[in-house]
Amino acid sequence: MGFQILTINPGSTSTKVAWFDDDKLVWKDSVEHDAVTLSQFPSIAAQFELRASEVEKAVEKHGSDLNTLDAVVGRGGLLRPISSGVYSVNETMLKELIDARYGEHASNLGAPIAHAIASKVGCPAFIVDPVVVDEMDDISRLSGWPELPRKSIFHALNQKAVARRVARDFFSVPYEQLNLIVAHLGGGISIGAHKKGRVVDVNNALGGEGPMSPERAGTLPIMKLADYLYEHKPDRKEFSKKLVGKGGWVAHLGTNSGKDLEERVKNGDEHAILILKATGYQISKWIAQMAVALAGEVDGIIITGGLAYIPELVDFIQERVLWIAPVFVVPGEDEMLALAEGALRVLRGQEEAKTY
């Protein structure tokens, strides 16, 4: 029997739980939380006991024994900017997450729940590559306004995980020896330049930068945006929603569904075809930008995330970027496996857990 690892990923209305034997999935579950029940809590942090209890019930339901665990891993929440890696859960981290010092999000409960369970059974608790991973070069942080530096917020967990797998399975070398461009294509789209294990440049997928995506507007013409603000004077919440949530495909087509778009394209919907091509075009341009960040020394380009299941989109992108480097398509995202793989590297002595 290998190392026994429990992974926990809290979302807005559910908590995903999975049990691994080394990197082999034993079982997984998604505990749904009633929206009305959750709305009665004054904060996300106040949901801790409810969600922790539900995680333990899921373990019991699947017949696993918490006392056999070698590690518990929670999804990393909103912390200060940190370098990539596996972090031991400590009191400083717990306090900042519970207090929502850097923002409130359901993922803030990942580390506290992992720590609570790990403390009961005497094993370590970790987080792996949270969205706040920041390894950008200083030169890539600058914008044309000193008051508005660029920030690193991206799909770090999935980008790092698929980059490691491609390095292992196709190059037979450690991830830290390669220069890769990883394009995570989901509800949000982030494209990162991975230079010998560090993401030295990446678009801020949550901050209005990059290609348009199913739900996000991406980079916009700035003077036109200023005109819109002066003319319409939207409130902050409404405006933020137009950028993240109701932008991109939602604004153009009224849908955020890749399957819906794919169906409309197959049925010959010319506007849907145009939006798919425009999305692919913008993604391709950002991939090319990241080749510049790597000075043209690119070993491979990885296309991952849920939209990588759309062949028309992937083919469009490949036609435009194959001149840069070979393209590897790794559809979907497996955050639970990525969490387990991080813990496994520490348990096997391949990596040392960092202190927050």
UniProtKB/Swiss-Prot annotation:
Its main location: cytoplasm. It catalyses: butanoate + ATP = butanoyl phosphate + ADP. The gene is buk. It comes from the Bacteria. Its EC number is 2.7.2.7. Belongs to the acetokinase family. One of its GO terms (cellular component) is cytoplasm. One of its GO terms (molecular function) is butyrate kinase activity. PROSITE patterns: ACETATE_KINASE_1 (PS01075), ACETATE_KINASE_2 (PS01076). The lineage of its organism: Bacteria, Pseudomonadati, Coprothermobacterota, Coprothermobacteria, Coprothermobacterales. It is an enzyme of class 2 (transferase). GO terms for biological process: acetate metabolic process. Keywords: ATP-binding, Cytoplasm, Kinase, Nucleotide-binding, Transferase. Gene3D superfamilies: 3.30.420.40. It is found in: Cytoplasm. The keyword ATP-binding applies. This is Probable butyrate kinase.
